[in-house]
């Protein structure tokens, strides 16, 4: 499999340190509110990557954190008159509900930042001892950016350009607490009304960037195979993670980096100020979760993706085609007689090959979806004449590749009441006797009972309305 490595800006063969075992870290949410559809993209994209790696027989150690201490969380708690902890616990539960609704597998480990304070302080000490960090006069601890000659290698930004062109950095000198405006906090001195922990530098709390470094090192080791997140995290978050991790550990932090593109709304950047801000829960309440997952797979993960109501409705309709196809396969396999055509075996093998070729090419989910719908077309064309073995082969391939994409997870088999079965049999008898009036009347009865009947070459097929 080849992936686009942000570090080198090119596609590379994705080779883990240990053959058959991938160690992956994905930046998780800051749980101060419901996640929006932009937050859902990395959640779905990298869950799909994990599923594919596992499908190909690999073991994946997948860590995705919960940021439960942050300026936004503190501010939210102050606005509500509650605590940061209460806010974090409430919205972590809502996040997990959304993640489950989107059919994202649970991480191997899902660490919280507040549970890793000692590990954070261990890295802070390593940085100070090696001269890469210093304690400011107020008790803040800053990373000394100029001590790292490789700083900027992920974002491909030069430190001199950052300092001269970034007003925000210049404004962060904070009364000469920093040696350099580009230096960033790895530990923040306590402020009144904010949560704080004991440290050798006085009461305080961790900086944002060091939380992920500590959780990654604790659960995956000093060098991981892949670090993932949204493009907005490349700088400063991921750049700073690399700097502090590699300076503390003395080795490569992450061998590969993957970043997903932004979500726009009606071709405009999603933002609260433009009133085009949608939470996952907002969209799911109207369309369900599964169309959101399907939508995220319709474009290459590195490309910007434009959210519109028309597109999400189109995804919902496409999912209905998939569900209908699978129901038709189930129906065909329940019949007593089958055809003799074996073509579907060949078409199922072709679909698997096309699917894997697409996924091996930097997680090309649009082409992978195309392979799924090519198989749907063949199933719809050939199921009436296919052998039982060919139908079973097609069903297995269909389930495999839709499962890797995390789709069709709401599939359920409706129990058919005896009354409905009896009416279907009576209707079939009426049709055989060419008693069309009775057949139509029974169809109307079935509709009133909440069932639709479709006449096929294999016989009448029922579906719940």
Locations of regions flagged by a protein language model:
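Alpha-helical recognition segments enriched in aromatics with Gly/Pro capping
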Residues: 1-32, 47, 97, 118-330
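N-terminal, positively charged nucleic-acid-binding surface of large information/translation enzymes
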Residues: 8-13, 17-105, 458-462
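Short phosphate-binding/catalytic loops that engage adenosine nucleotides
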Residues: 58, 132, 451
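Short, glycine/charge-rich beta-strand/loop segments that flank catalytic centers
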Residues: 66-70, 92-95, 105-120, 138-147
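The substrate-binding groove and active-site-proximal loops of carbohydrate-active enzymes
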Residues: 78-84, 108-114, 230
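Structural preference for alpha-helix termini/caps and helix-kink/transition segments
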Residues: 269-270, 277-465
């Amino acid at each position: 499999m080849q992936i686009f490595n942000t570090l080198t800006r090119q596609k590379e063969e994705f080779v883990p340190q240990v053959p058959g075992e991938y160690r992956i870290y994905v930046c998780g949410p800051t749980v101060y509110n419901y996640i929006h559809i932009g937050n859902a993209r990395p959640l779905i994209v990298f869950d799909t990557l994990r599923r594919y790696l596992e499908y190909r027989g690999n073991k994946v150690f997948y860590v995705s954190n919960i940021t439960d201490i942050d300026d936004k969380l503190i501010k939210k708690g102050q606005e509500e008159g509650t605590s940061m902890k209460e806010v974090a616990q409430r919205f972590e539960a809502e996040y997990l509900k959304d993640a489950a609704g989107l059919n994202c597998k649970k991480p191997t480990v899902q660490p919280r930042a507040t549970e890793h304070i000692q590990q954070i302080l261990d890295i802070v000490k390593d940085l100070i001892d090696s001269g890469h960090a210093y304690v400011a006069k107020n008790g803040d601890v800053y990373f000394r950016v100029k001590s790292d000659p490789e700083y900027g290698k992920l974002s491909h930004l030069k430190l001199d350009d950052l300092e001269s062109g970034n007003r925000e950095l210049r404004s962060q000198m904070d009364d000469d607490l920093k040696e350099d405006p580009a230096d960033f906090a790895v530990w923040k001195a306590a402020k009144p009304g904010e949560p704080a922990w004991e440290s050798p530098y006085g009461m305080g709390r961790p900086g944002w960037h060091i939380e992920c470094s500590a959780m990654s090192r604790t659960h995956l080791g000093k060098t991981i195979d892949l670090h993932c997140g949204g493009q907005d995290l490349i700088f400063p978050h991921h750049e700073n993670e690399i700097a502090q991790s590699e300076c503390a550990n003395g080795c490569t932090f992450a061998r590969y980096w993957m970043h997903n593109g932004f979500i726009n709304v009606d071709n405009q950047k999603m933002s609260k100020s433009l009133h085009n801000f949608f939470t996952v829960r907002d969209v799911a309440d109207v369309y369900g979760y599964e169309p959101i997952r399907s939508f995220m797979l319709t474009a290459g993960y590195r490309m910007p993706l434009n959210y519109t109501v028309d597109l999400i409705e189109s995804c919902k309709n496409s999912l209905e085609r998939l569900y209908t196809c699978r129901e038709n396969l189930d129906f065909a396999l329940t019949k007593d007689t089958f055809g003799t055509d074996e073509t579907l075996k060949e078409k199922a093998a072709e679909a698997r090959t096309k699917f894997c070729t697409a996924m091996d090419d930097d997680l090309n989910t649009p082409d992978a979806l195309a392979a799924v719908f090519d198989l749907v077309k063949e199933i719809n064309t050939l199921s009436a004449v296919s052998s039982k073995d060919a139908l079973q082969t097609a069903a297995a391939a269909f389930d495999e590749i839709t499962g890797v994409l995390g789709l069709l997870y709401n599939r359920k088999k409706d129990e058919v009441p005896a009354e409905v079965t009896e009416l279907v049999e009576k209707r079939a008898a009426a049709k055989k006797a060419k008693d069309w009036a009775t057949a139509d009347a029974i169809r109307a009865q079935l509709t009133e009972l909440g069932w639709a009947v479709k006449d096929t070459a294999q016989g009448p097929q029922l579906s719940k309305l």
